[in-house]
Amino acid sequence: MIRSTTNGTLKTYRYNLQRSSYTKNKAQETLQTQRKFNSFAEDPAAAAKAFQLRRSLLRTDSQYNVGDSVKHKYEVAWNTLESVTQDVNNRKSDSAFAMILQGKSDTIGSGAVALGQSMRTLATGIVQSMNCRYGENFVFAGADGLNVPFEWQGEGDDRKLCYRGIPVDTKEPPEIELGADGKTPKTFDATGTETTDPAKAVSYKTKDGMVNIADYDKQKKEWDALEYMAKGERKNADLGFGMQEDEKGNVISSSVANVGLQGITFLGYGKDADGDPKNIVSIADRLGTLLRRCDTNSGDWASAADKKEFSRLAKKFEDAASQLTDKHTEMDTQAAFIKSNQDQLKANTDTLQEQFLGIEDVDLADAITSYSWAQYCYNVSIKVGNSILSQSLMDYINT
């Protein structure tokens, strides 16, 4: 027979009571926090997995936010190009295309000068549209979103359109003759004699003839800048393509998205073989200048050369307008891809969130049930304690 003593009973009771109290408090904490664990030590395996999921979730959420900003930026860009495209493709009553059709006919008469002014005004309006912003950044400024991309330099008929400080009508410089090493350019003095003395060198030799060294270097610098902005400059964004760097620390281009929009890739830059601008705004501005030279009363051309130039530029304007439409369509495709990528990132976020909640969060119904049972057990322990204390007190009185 096992002898039950008062001290033994109290000791067992205290142990069970403490355990019931701990279980109740733990169940209460779980119900309040709605988490399965609150420290790494409580469940190291689950905590490590939750950390990995949380890191992936934060990265995906960041990619989604960046992509959302890019999507809205492209929406602004698309709407702007839609407006510009309508202006140059005869979709509005004051479109540049309609003006050119009028200008090519011989029925303008005294309205030629007014039409020319409208053409120049339209060119100015296109530039203002292309200087649109999304938030604090200019949409068509490439990687330099803080500074206005397009601006006019000069006044009147001599004004020139510049993109980020570089004239858009800069012509690609011709190749220059090189020395025997195939790298160093040949230089010539004022008499056209080849010289290696830098102090006497004033010209390079090209297929088009002699060119001033300073002028050529300036032209090449400007052309290289335009080429870099149009084809080489990038504004990378992590949109969930697995952004990674190579061994030199450079971002692998295929792992990021280039979200920089260069205005000159849409409007054009440089000059063609005839020396005419490729930029659609410059062409429209030049057409307006030619019309404004016409006689204010009769509308006659200022010269036969002006009429010939106008006809030549009118055809090139139509070609530039067609290229602008193609670029607009291309942007539509890019915008659709970004939207599709956003949908994928949203789906990834939802999946990670579901996995994350499955590891860290408790089922609320189970938590309430566990707490209710723990509370019940604790209350029973208190009642048992009352019985034990009462019996002990009676034993004490009876002794």
For the regions a language model picked out, list residue spans one by one:
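Amphipathic alpha-helical polymerization modules
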Residues: 1-146, 292-399
